């Protein structure tokens, strides 16, 4: 497993982690940042079947409570309506500025979650767990 820290300014610290089966390591790294213990995971139906439960289990074992937000599969859902539905769900869940959003999926999920994290409450912490090569670049 490789890690590279990217710091652009005092508020923006990014850590790039490369490796296989990085769920445990990613959750451990979340603990290093000053984030709330409540988080929301954005994923789609396909990815949720394979990877959501291990992530939820690891988060719970580290003291996090997590809610999942499942979005439809497909490029056609990368739009403001879907982003708006995610934002509405975050409000319903009581997510605040310290609560991280975790994107678990391909390009559509990572792009949508990144956009939502940047506009929700003037920005919230974001962790990307890409599951496709395109989402990684």
Model-derived features: positions:
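ATP/NTP phosphate-donor binding region
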Residues: 1-99
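Glycine/threonine-rich beta-strand-loop-alpha-helix active-site module
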Residues: 78-137
């Amino acid at each position: 497993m490789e890690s590279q820290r990217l710091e652009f300014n005092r508020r923006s610290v990014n850590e790039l982690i490369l490796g296989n089966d990085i769920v445990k390591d990613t959750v451990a790294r979340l603990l290093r940042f000053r984030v709330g213990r409540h988080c929301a995971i954005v994923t789609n139906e396909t990815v949720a079947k394979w990877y959501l439960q291990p992530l939820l289990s690891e988060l719970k074992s580290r003291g996090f409570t997590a809610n999942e937000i499942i979005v439809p599969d497909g490029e056609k859902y990368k739009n403001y309506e879907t982003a708006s539905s995610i934002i509405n769900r975050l409000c319903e869940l009581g997510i605040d500025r310290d609560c991280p959003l975790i994107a678990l999926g391909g390009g559509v999920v990572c792009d949508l979650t990144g956009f939502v994290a940047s506009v929700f409450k003037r920005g919230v912490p974001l962790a990307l767990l890409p599951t496709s090569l395109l989402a990684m670049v």
